[in-house]
Every structure is written in structure tokens, then in C-alpha cells.
Design a protein with these regions (language model features):
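Extended catalytic-interface subdomain
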Residues: 108-112, 131, 256, 264-290
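Short, surface-exposed beta-strand/loop micro-motifs that present aromatic residues
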Residues: 18-20, 28-34, 197-202, 252-260
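Mature N-terminal segment immediately following signal peptide/propeptide cleavage
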Residues: 7-45
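Active-site-adjacent, His/Asp/Glu-enriched structural segments that form or flank metal-binding
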Residues: 38, 47-161, 190, 194-208, ...
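An aromatic/glycine/proline-enriched structural segment found at the starts
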Residues: 5-6, 173, 210-268, 272-276
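Histidine-acidic residue clusters that define the catalytic metal-binding segment
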Residues: 5-19, 107-110, 117, 125, ...
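Short, solvent-exposed loop/turn segments at the edges of secondary structure
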Residues: 24, 38-40, 89, 100-104, ...
Length: 290
């Protein structure tokens, strides 16, 4: 058959200019020098943590925690992160942002003018505080409840209502049908402060985190600074297993129909279910062409 005659495709080579390392605590880092444009760099921290890890009484906490990363850390109290970055031309919502998805949460500081070492150090310190040193002050949490309540309210359009009807049927028997990151208004308005702190301590930990720095930087210096700044962060005792949720097989085609009086258009989604692909298999050309 054609499938049997298909030659084995080679693996995708790792860019030799990317410095990849892992600290003893499990945190992974990726650093690459790139002079286009000059004197600019991007900083990321990615967490393999999203709304899928929430329990029913935590729905919305992954997204809420993302918001709280801009509301006070040990080294940048209050709006300190936003205020300091604005002094170097990095603006919230433009070059400074984050997103929460079902499976991951990613924070970015982009287009940073790395014209002196102190700026690089401070951006890494922000990543450090996001990773391990959020304040999560009660007054700030309560202030953010109103912000996220409004985000939830304005997001309750026809498409969201249709998603909430269709997803539990499309992903029947799986948490994926019930974990849109915005969560539920009951949780947003009423969760106890400690619930958010517990979620942070449980899941924001080195073995689930990766640092990415790309730009006009000295790779050796950045690597040394990451080792100096992040190596002290300890894994929690008896860390919870990061379970990767599955979606049950189905023999018959699943068909779901959702209607809403405010949606005048017909929208059709066709989803093809396939076995989960392990990360190590994603580095081959075969994965890209399949």
C-alpha cells in the first residue's frame, strides 16, 4: 500500500543556536540570540497549567490567577510591574500580556529595549516573581473580582452560550466539556482567598514552567542570571501529579446542535478525533505532514 511505501521522514533538527537547559528543580529554559531588531528582546514564562486542572469549585481560578500576576509581587508591589515597564516603553496590553487556555498559561514581555543589563535583569525578575512570588493580597483579589465579573458578563454572547451547550455533548465524559477558562460567575464572585493561593502553590512550580528569552542579548549572561535567580525555587513537598485528561472514544459520530436567537448565521464545526501525540513524536517531519 501507499502507506507502507512511505519513507521514514527525518526528525526536525533543533536550532543549534537555541540554548536549552534544565535546572535541578525541573524548570526548563530556552535562550536564543537574535539581532533583528537590534537592542530588543522578548521574555516569556510558559506554565503547563490551564483551566483543565481546576476542580468544579475552582472554575475560573486559572484565569483569575493570570490577572493577579499584574496586581502585586514581592519585588513589584501593587501595579509595580506595569508602572516600571512603562518607564522603558513597554505597555500593558500591547507588549505586556498573558493568556490562559485550557491546557496552558503563558505570560509575555515583548519588544523590550535591552539597552542595559539592568533591564534584562529586571525582566527576568518579573518572570521570577510570576513563577514564585505573587502577593495575592485580599484587597487586590476583591478588586479583580469586579474586573473579571465584567469580562464574564461581556463575554456572554450568542457564541459563548452555544459553546456552553455544545461542548459538554461533544466531549461527553471528559472535563474538556466543562473547563472554558472564564469559569463560572459563582466561583469568581465567591471563592475564598486561600483557594487561589492553594491553586498557585499547587500548580505554579518549576517542573511545569519554562522560560524563553529571545533577542539581542548575551546568551551566556542570561543563562547565568536564570540559574542564579530561579535555582532557589523549590518544588512543593509531595507535588500533585499533572494529569493529562483524556477524551473517551465514541463508536458513533457525535452530533451536537446548539441554537441561539442572537446568532443569525449557521456555523458548522467538524472535529476529527485522533490518539494523543506524545511530545517526543512532534519533532519529526512525519508529524507535520500528517
Amino acid at each position: 500500500s501507499m502507506a507502507q511505501q512511505q519513507p521514514q521522514m527525518p526528525p526536525i533538527p533543533t536550532d543549534p543556536n537555541v540554548r536549552i537547559g534544565k535546572l535541578e528543580n525541573g524548570l526548563t529554559y530556552y535562550i536564543r540570540h537574535n539581532e533583528l531588531p537590534e537592542n530588543r528582546a522578548d521574555f516569556y514564562i510558559a506554565q503547563k497549567v490551564g483551566s483543565i486542572l481546576e476542580e468544579e469549585n475552582q472554575r475560573g481560578l486559572a484565569h483569575f490567577l493570570e490577572h493577579m500576576c499584574f496586581n502585586g509581587t514581592t519585588n513589584f508591589p501593587g501595579k509595580g510591574i506595569i508602572n516600571w515597564l512603562e518607564t522603558i516603553g513597554v505597555r500593558f496590553g500591547e507588549n505586556l500580556n498573558a493568556y490562559t487556555s485550557i491546557d496552558e498559561t503563558v505570560y509575555n514581555i515583548n519588544n523590550v529595549p535591552v539597552i542595559r543589563d539592568g533591564i534584562v535583569d529586571s525582566c527576568l525578575l518579573i518572570l521570577h516573581d510570576w513563577a514564585n512570588d505573587l502577593t495575592l493580597a485580599e484587597a487586590e483579589i476583591d478588586n479583580e473580582r469586579g474586573v473579571i465579573h465584567e469580562e464574564w458578563r461581556t463575554g456572554q454572547g450568542a457564541m459563548m452560550r452555544m459553546y456552553e451547550k455544545a461542548l459538554p455533548k461533544a466531549f461527553e465524559g471528559s472535563k474538556y466539556g466543562h473547563r472554558l477558562p472564564i469559569g463560572t460567575i459563582e466561583v469568581i464572585d465567591n471563592f475564598p482567598y486561600q483557594a487561589l493561593r492553594d491553586y498557585y502553590e499547587k500548580w505554579y512550580r518549576p517542573d511545569q514552567q519554562g522560560i524563553v528569552v529571545v533577542g539581542d542579548i548575551d546568551v551566556d549572561k542570561v543563562e547565568a542570571k536564570i540559574k542564579e535567580m530561579f535555582s532557589h525555587i523549590q518544588m512543593p513537598e509531595n507535588p500533585a501529579e499533572r494529569v493529562y485528561e483524556t477524551i473517551p472514544d465514541n463508536k458513533e459520530t457525535i452530533v451536537t446542535i446548539a441554537k441561539d436567537k442572537e446568532q443569525p448565521n449557521v456555523i458548522v464545526y467538524l472535529w476529527h478525533k485522533h490518539p494523543a501525540v506524545p511530545n517526543e513524536a512532534k519533532v519529526s517531519m512525519q508529524y507535520l505532514v500528517q
